[in-house]
Amino acid sequence: MSSSNQVKGFYFNAQRRLSRAQALCQNSQDTLHNMQLLLVRWQRTVSKLQFTIHCICNQTVFLAECILKKTVGQQLIETEWKRMLLDELQGEMQRSQEEITGKIDALRRTKNELDGSGATLADFISMENIFLLGDKLKDVPVVQEQVEHIKVQYESLVDKVVEQLQNNRVRKLEADFAAAFRSGKNDFNAFSMKYLQKIRQLETDLADILKSLTDHYDKCSLLKAGDLPAAEQAELFEVVKNDDQELDSIMGVLEVIVRDIKSLAKNVSIRLRQKERDKQQLKNAMGKAHSELLKYEEHLTVFQGIDDLIRNFKASCLHNVSKVRELCEFYDNFLNSYQVLLREVERRRRVAKQMEDILQACEGQLMALSDTDLKQRQQFLMRHGDYLPENIWPGNIDDLSPLYDLEYRIKKV
């Protein structure tokens, strides 16, 4: 075979092998790319599963420890309801009720000394509001019974959340996730990193083979063009000739890589189908755990409703305590003012007596002065009456009536 025909044979052989290799590499590269995307997507899926399970776990702990034990148990039941309402407020109402009862008794023991009817100061006040706290105190045992009933429900709910949900369902969920994706041969991170590394290596192998075949094709094209000097042309011919003999081996390696890629894709597909079943089981378990968590959270509305009722009862009790305190203060002022009134009555009586004494003394002086005046008028008439005409001072010359007219009344106090 002539050198020219050999060059053409090298060229067409290189072109055919390169075209075949490009097609195989493209298909294999697509397979590797899809595997890579699938593994990365699964990595995100596993991370999302882990995050969601972690959220369910944290939410369960938050429900049990913060909401139920701390807020409902300690703050509401033990502090707000039992200590502040049933102990402290009840004690305050009892003290206020005893205080107002004592005030009423003091008024009942104090007789009204001003009208002589035998009435007491208690007869002058309304008894309408003195039993306000007594009625509320009767309601306290009912509230206490409700609180004890709610406490039993609370303890049952805490037990269910801690034992059934937190220690059972959620822990099993965490264990199932760890068994499916984080332990031993099922460690998905190790699995995905291992296969991603293989994918990168196979991509490199494909690229190397394709580069080698492309370089050979470029050399064949340059040799076929015949533009090189004779010595370089001869040297290139030998290189191309030797490379041409390696093409079958290179294509064999490529086909092995292609088979490895197909086998790898099959293994990944089988493994991910298994993981898909694990994922679905976990999602079902997560859904049940989340539904159970929501169910227990809905029970919190019971505590909220009871808390609203107790707060209203407490506000009503405090309002009545305030009214009773105002009444106690009013009764104190009433009793004190009555004592002051008695002193005021005595003062007025003394003033009336002083006025009576003054008027009696004045009356005596007026009578003495009037008697003296009468004698002097009589003497005047005896000496001068016969000489004065009546009409010079009509009705007065011979008038012997007193010059004063004194009438008075001292008000009886």
Swiss-Prot record:
It is a peripheral membrane protein. It is found in: Cytoplasm; Preautophagosomal structure membrane. One of its GO terms (cellular component) is phagophore assembly site membrane. Residues 262-300 form a coiled coil. Autophagy-specific protein that functions in response to autophagy-inducing signals as a scaffold to recruit other ATG proteins to organize pre-autophagosomal structure (PAS) formation. Modulates the timing and magnitude of the autophagy response, such as the size of the sequestering vesicles. Plays particularly a role in pexophagy and nucleophagy. It comes from the Eukaryota. It comes from Eremothecium gossypii (strain ATCC 10895 / CBS 109.51 / FGSC 9923 / NRRL Y-1056) (Yeast). PANTHER family: AUTOPHAGY-RELATED PROTEIN 17 (PTHR28005:SF1). Belongs to the ATG17 family. GO terms for molecular function: molecular adaptor activity; protein kinase activator activity; SNARE binding. The gene is ATG17. InterPro entries: Atg17 (IPR007240), ATG17-like_dom (IPR045326). This is Autophagy-related protein 17. GO terms for biological process: autophagosome assembly; cellular response to nitrogen starvation; mitophagy; pexophagy; piecemeal microautophagy of the nucleus; positive regulation of autophagosome assembly; positive regulation of autophagosome size; protein localization to phagophore assembly site. Keywords: Autophagy, Coiled coil, Cytoplasm, Membrane.
